[in-house]
Swiss-Prot record:
The keyword Ligase does not apply. Belongs to the RecF family. One of its GO terms (biological process) is DNA replication. HAMAP family: RecF. This is DNA replication and repair protein RecF. It is found in: Cytoplasm. GO terms for cellular component: cytoplasm. The gene is recF. NCBIfam families: recf. The keyword DNA repair applies. Its main location: cytoplasm. One of its GO terms (molecular function) is single-stranded DNA binding. PANTHER family: DNA REPLICATION AND REPAIR PROTEIN RECF (PTHR32182:SF0).
Length: 370
């Protein structure tokens, strides 16, 4: 799938603009602070109804404007298209429309417009908290396993109920048994989906990484959040008093993690910044392959400042892998010439110059390298 039309109003320093991107490679270049990343942010807002740069939405809205609005026309694999629209005002109210109909859940946006973000904060996937790696994992499961969302909602409800009882309820075995059983059932289902996903992801990730980086000894493993040799219901029973003292459930899928190591060391501790970036890129690209294999369409990749941390050889390798995905890619850089050799002659490339918030399309999506 791809965005064939994109309209942006009221996003940071960007002037109101309507673009017709290439279905494949789109390069946005210009000085730092010109607004390149803001366009990626607008696409992210369209796909997830939130920014990747700020938890608060007020900084995203152009100064003295009441709201920011993004519209997009999405071309689907079945030759149909869908119209998406997202608007957020300064009070925090969000309006989502799909094909003219109001929608409540941002999950419907995510399902229609699967986005992969690679930006300077991507290092956090390796060095940050387990929550970030769970989000990465669950994004992938969500897009390949249609039953995941229902199980996830049951898990969250059971967790809320048990945690509330731990903090405020009377300590009795009947209540604990009820909440623990519901939590265990949902947890086993979530764990099964995650485990199957990791089994599919690992070989694709390893193959992708080899194309980017000569790195021996890197391993990817999955920790489910409780003892692999014990049923969760037994773990919950044995840790009841401790959970009660802490006021929350300490074992379960909400404590899961992906572990990337080189030998016995965490990858983030021993890899250079450039190596870390390539590992994260390999993970994101592998996810895109799995989405495509699941017949769920293709991801759209948002790559902010692709050249940073990478030498010419690794920039070229990354461009080639993104090109081989046959998906739509939006890339920002300061100097577009460093990416000119990254694409095949027949790959449609569109070039956009960004200056002081003004976006000018220099080359339309043709079959000739820009």
């Amino acid at each position: 799938m791809s965005l064939s039309r994109l309209s942006v109003t009221g996003v940071r320093n960007l002037h109101p603009v309507t673009l017709s991107p290439s279905p494949r490679i789109n390069i946005l270049f210009g000085d730092n602070g010109s607004g390149k990343t803001s366009l990626l942010e607008a696409i992210h807002l369209l796909g997830l109804a939130r920014s990747f740069r700020s938890i608060r939405l007020n900084p995203v809205i152009t100064y003295e404007q009441p709201a920011c609005t993004v519209f997009g026309q999405v071309e689907l694999p079945d030759q149909h298209s869908r119209a998406l629209g997202v608007s957020r005002d300064r009070s925090g109210e969000v309006r989502i429309r799909i094909d003219g109909q109001s929608v409540r859940s941002a999950a419907e946006l995510a399902d229609t417009l699967p986005l992969q973000l690679i930006n300077p904060d991507s290092f956090r996937l390796l060095e940050g908290a387990p929550k970030l790696r769970r989000q990465f994992l669950d994004w992938g499961v969500f897009h390949v396993e249609h039953r995941f969302m229902s199980a996830w909602q049951r898990l969250q409800q059971a967790l809320r109920q048990r945690n509330s009882w731990l903090r405020h309820g009377t300590l009795d075995s009947a209540s604990d048994a009820a909440w623990s059983r519901e939590l265990s059932l949902a947890s086993d289902e979530i764990d099964g989906y995650r485990r199957a996903y990791i089994q599919a992801l690992k070989p694709v990730f390893e193959t992708t990484l080899k194309a980017l980086l000569d790195l021996d000894g890197l391993t990817l493993s999955y920790y489910r959040g409780w003892d692999k040799d014990r049923p969760l219901v037994d773990v919950l029973a044995s840790s009841l008093e401790r959970d009660r003292a802490m006021g929350h459930t300490q074992s379960g899928p909400q404590r899961a993690d992906l572990r990337l190591k080189v030998g016995s060391h965490n990858a983030a501790e021993v890899l250079s910044r450039g190596q870390q970036k390539l590992v994260v890129c390999a993970l994101r690209i592998a996810q895109g392959h799995l989405v495509s294999e699941a017949k769920r369409g293709q991801c759209i990749y948002l790559v902010d400042d692709l050249p940073s941390e990478l030498d010419a050889q690794h920039r070229l390798a990354l461009c080639r892998l993104l090109e081989q995905l046959n998906c739509q890619v939006f890339i920002t850089c300061v100097d577009s010439t460093v990416l000119q050799e990254g694409w095949g002659e027949q790959t449609p490339v569109s070039m956009f110059h960004v200056e002081h918030g003004q976006i000018t399309q220099l080359h339309g999506p043709s079959g000739v390298k820009a």
